[in-house]
Amino acid sequence: MPLASDVKQKIMSDYATVERDTGSPEVQVAMLTRRISDLTEHLKVHKHDHHSRRGLLLLVGRRRRLLNYLAKTDINRYRALIERLGLRR
């Protein structure tokens, strides 16, 4: 399920490196993390929703690839981001 535009704006303003930043890895990972948490809550209620489970796995893979890219290019930004989002690595 897509995020509401006000939620997207809030995430962008919190994680943007410059104003109107939508493409930086930090913003993308933060948005994916929000979608992943929403889908996880949905799947706790609807255990047999396999279509959404596959979508969740795709989102987790996309987030993992972005985090790997960030770790390779700038380890300090990577560490700060996972600390801020509360992700374990």
From Swiss-Prot:
Disulfide bonds: none annotated. Coiled coil: none annotated. GO terms for molecular function: rRNA binding; structural constituent of ribosome. The keyword Ligase does not apply. One of the primary rRNA binding proteins, it binds directly to 16S rRNA where it helps nucleate assembly of the platform of the 30S subunit by binding and bridging several RNA helices of the 16S rRNA. The keyword Cell membrane does not apply. CDD domains: Ribosomal_S15p_S13e. This is Small ribosomal subunit protein uS15. GO terms for biological process: translation. Keywords: Ribonucleoprotein, Ribosomal protein, RNA-binding, rRNA-binding. It comes from Frankia casuarinae (strain DSM 45818 / CECT 9043 / HFP020203 / CcI3). Pfam families: Ribosomal_S15.
